[in-house]
Amino acid sequence: MSSGIGSLVKVIFKNFDVIAGPVISLVYPLYASVRAIESRSHGDDKQWLTYWALYSLIKLFELTFFRLLEWIPLYPYAKLALTSWLVLPGMNGAAYLYEHYVRSFLLSPHTVNVWYVPAKKDDDLGATAGKFTPVNDSGAPQEKIVSSVDTSAKYVGHSAFDDAYIY
């Protein structure tokens, strides 16, 4: 019987991130968020709103770089440690991370440095169009003749789904 319990403990320790990850990152925050909604104080609301914003950023990062992250052997444990720091009530990791990094990034004006500006070419649209303008025998550009539009034709809006549509 002891070998069965030993095997179970071994499996639990090997897969600790798989077992504890959803509990720490989803179950407890959902429970605490519902309690925060039902309470009258707004301090805990801010903690859990910032947690869910950071959780969505973490998930977006994971979905974007999942091929790279699967090659990092300690990533699940690092994510579990980070999530634990964000969630645990005494640490207020979500509020700290939001106030010091995310908020300052979102509120600061962003500038874009353009390191390469291509030189303007002589072949702009006007010059290119001039190359293909018809020329008469004297060498002068020929006036373009616009044909008159037949306005007597009536548009009958048929679609392929109408019974009167002719194939």
Curated annotation (Swiss-Prot):
Topology versus the membrane: Multi-pass membrane protein
In which broad location class does this protein mainly occur, judging by the first location in its UniProt entry? membrane
Write out the tissue specificity statement of the associated record: Predominantly expressed in flower buds.
GO cellular component terms, A-Z: membrane
Give yes or no: UniProt keyword Transmembrane helix.
yes
Membrane-traversing stretches: 18-38, 47-67, 68-88
Keywords of the record, alphabetical order, are: Membrane, Stress response, Transmembrane, Transmembrane helix
Family stated for the protein in its record? Belongs to the DP1 family.
What is the name listed in the Swiss-Prot or TrEMBL entry for this protein? HVA22-like protein b
Species in which this protein is naturally found? Arabidopsis thaliana
* Organismal lineage: Eukaryota, Viridiplantae, Streptophyta, Embryophyta, Tracheophyta
